[in-house]
């Protein structure tokens, strides 16, 4: 008997490759950062001006001679003192009790008295519901990060953002910050507390083996989505 060996076609091999790639892509859940704006900005190039022939150049660094060094232009840097301490507690409860009772007789004709003489109907119902719930959360974040002014609003407020990355062994940790700063809240040390920043967004995350160990596997997530309980 002649044996014929069938080799997998290119279509089957391509389908297997696509399936493996899809499963590999499910191993990690992509997570978009909460800060979408650029992390830094370069100041615009100053317009070339003719030298006035004096020691002081009014166009140097874009600052007048007797002005303080607080950031106010795109590209200036500012130190953010992160001091976040948020506590939240919530509790709720519900209690409902309802009862009902109905009793009535069915009128019958005289010739049917022997058949429906005891046809009395009564119904009783009760419904009771009780539930309690509670939740609490506490978050503390302290640190410093230096950010860059990326935009100056018409009212003078500064849109800032910045990123700090730290590579520790096999893990890459980074801190991102963005918000709107009022120049009047900037101290003489060129710093401002995060509690004084409007629309503040703080992100602390990491990439590495520790972060992967805290992530649920794709097969476990698959069965978790299928489980009805």
From Swiss-Prot:
UniProt source species: Burkholderia vietnamiensis (strain G4 / LMG 22486) (Burkholderia cepacia (strain R1808))
Keyword Lipoprotein belongs to the record: yes
Compartment(s): Cell outer membrane; Bacterial flagellum basal body
GO cellular component terms, semicolon-separated: bacterial-type flagellum basal body, distal rod, L ring; cell outer membrane
Disulfide bonds: none
Major place of residence: membrane
Purpose: Assembles around the rod to form the L-ring and probably protects the motor/basal body from shearing forces during rotation.
Keywords linked to the UniProt accession: Bacterial flagellum, Cell outer membrane, Lipoprotein, Membrane, Palmitate, Signal
Classification via NCBIfam families: PRK12697.1
Pfam families, alphabetized: FlgH
Residues with a covalently attached lipid (S-diacylglycerol cysteine): 26
Name of the protein: Flagellar L-ring protein
N-palmitoyl cysteine lipid attachment residues: 26
MF term (GO), any: cytoskeletal motor activity
Biological process terms in GO annotation: bacterial-type flagellum-dependent cell motility
Keyword Oxidoreductase tagged: no
Organism phylogeny: Bacteria, Pseudomonadati, Pseudomonadota, Betaproteobacteria, Burkholderiales
Similarity field: Belongs to the FlgH family.
Signal peptide: 1-25
InterPro entries for this protein: Flag_Lring
Subunit structure: The basal body constitutes a major portion of the flagellar organelle and consists of four rings (L,P,S, and M) mounted on a central rod.
Source species, domain of life: Bacteria
Membrane topology, record value: Lipid-anchor
């Amino acid at each position: 008997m002649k044996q014929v060996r069938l080799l997998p076609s290119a279509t089957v091999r391509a389908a297997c490759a696509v399936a493996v790639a899809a499963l590999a892509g499910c191993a990690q859940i992509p997570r978009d950062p909460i800060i979408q704006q650029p992390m830094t900005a370069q100041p615009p190039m100053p317009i070339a001006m003719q030298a006035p022939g004096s020691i002081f150049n009014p166009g140097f660094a874009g600052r007048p001679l007797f002005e303080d060094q607080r950031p106010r232009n795109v590209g200036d840097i500012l130190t953010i003192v992160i001091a976040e301490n948020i506590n939240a507690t919530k509790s709720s409860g519900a209690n409902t009790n309802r009862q009902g009772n109905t009793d009535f007789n069915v009128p019958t004709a005289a010739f049917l008295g022997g058949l429906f003489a005891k046809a009395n109907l009564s119904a009783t119902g009760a419904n009771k519901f009780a539930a309690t719930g509670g939740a609490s959360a506490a978050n503390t974040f302290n640190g410093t990060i230096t950010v860059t002014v990326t935009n100056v609003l018409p009212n003078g407020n500064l849109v800032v953002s910045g990123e700090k990355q730290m590579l520790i062994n096999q893990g890459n940790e980074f801190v991102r910050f963005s918000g709107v700063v009022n120049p009047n809240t900037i101290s003489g040390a060129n710093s401002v507390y995060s509690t004084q920043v409007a629309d503040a967004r703080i992100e602390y995350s990491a990439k590495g083996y520790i972060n992967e160990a805290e992530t649920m596997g794709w097969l476990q997530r698959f069965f978790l989505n299928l489980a009805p309980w």
